[in-house]
Amino acid sequence: GSSDFLAVAVREVKEETGVEKPFPQSGAILSLDVLPVPAHEKHGKSVECHKHYNVTYGLIVNPKEKLRIKPDENSAVQWIPVENLKEMVKEQHMLPIYEKLIARMRKQKQMQTEVMAQIAAPLLTWYPSHARDLPWRRTKEPYRIWLSEVMLQQTRVEAVKGYYQRFLENFPDVQSLAAATQDQVNKCWEGLGYYTRAANLRKAAQVICTEHRGVFPDTYAAVRRLPGVGEYTAGAVCSICYEQPTPAVDGNVLRVIARVTDCFCEIDRPAMKQAVTEGLRAVYAEGNCGMLTQSLMELGATVCLPNGQLLCSACPLAAFCMGRKNQDVLRLPQRTTKKKRRTEQYTVFLMRCEGKYAVQKRQEKGLLHGLWEFPNVPGIHTAEEAIQMAASWGTAPKDLVRTAEKKHIFTHVEWELFGVYLDCGRAAEPFVWKSPEEIAAEISLPTAFRQFALDLP
């Protein structure tokens, strides 16, 4: 009864064969056929001759997936090499149909490859008049391009602009960044999140100064070896700064390519990213590598948007976009099922003594390791329990000023935070005690804790 034939095809493959993760090669219908079915017996009952109206799609399955017999539908399920099909097919009258469908799947694959080969020219024509004026696009200096790409990971462009300018004012080159303390770098990064990026920036700057004599490396392999630099960042730096054919493939680019080729492979699988990277490498034009990288980024950020925002009429690739032709844009890209974000609870202590508040560096490995924080303990405790804990730390709590509930969301975890503001009689160790002005000027607090600092009485 469903009108979504593709969804029915995927469901039937799962039910008939037992495979768990089939995906369409394309959303296009391979064939529409009317097939006569002769009279036969099924489960001991006579079935009169009739017709099957077949809508056929080509699906891809990992051959390592286990097959399962469904007794009421089939007696055997197995993988058959295409070259053995003729010998293995029991119903020889179906062989021409199967051969036709296999040929069409191969044709679909060829069309997807041909579409990839067409994208460069229209993108290079479109980009100069549609590119946003962003500060890091006014340079090809590798230090600045590298910095911008690291900042833009998991962060909106508008949020990055101010941080980018401020960071360069404090650390205008790789030498000044290498010479800075991690606290100085973190303070400049404060509020941008994902502080591991800031730590790796400083480590990479030190590597550049010690191993490359302060000169930013100019090969993909050398850039890739820098701490915290992945395939995407290395590809962006080398294509934009050095005009090397090194694609920078992120979620935006994967979405564009999945749609333009009508590819249903889950984009967060490494094999998909690798295939797109190799496909793009083949179409990079000498002398235009940087512009092609930036045009793909721009298209994914401004036109080929996620979440059902269709701007296909403004897309330079619309004329040959297979996803648009097959009306699959809203289906794409496909992703693996995300795990539900877990929730953690903490009680946060805002302990004040003579106008100064207790802070400490986070010792726990993992999230926010090594960063400044207000003292905290797992779980949501009552104010009375919190006062007892503060007393056990030697801070001599005198008055409960107030409490506050906050929340902070990371990529994979959500923190529920209960803040307890206490007036204390003793600035106990090992806490470091800072005034609100000193906190604002000297130390970097992650956003989860900085939201409490904004409300300090």
Description of each model-found segment:
Residues 86, 90-109:
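C-terminal tail/extension regions appended to the core domain(s) of diverse proteins
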Residues 122, 126-311, 320-322:
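Catalytic cores of DNA base-excision repair glycosylases
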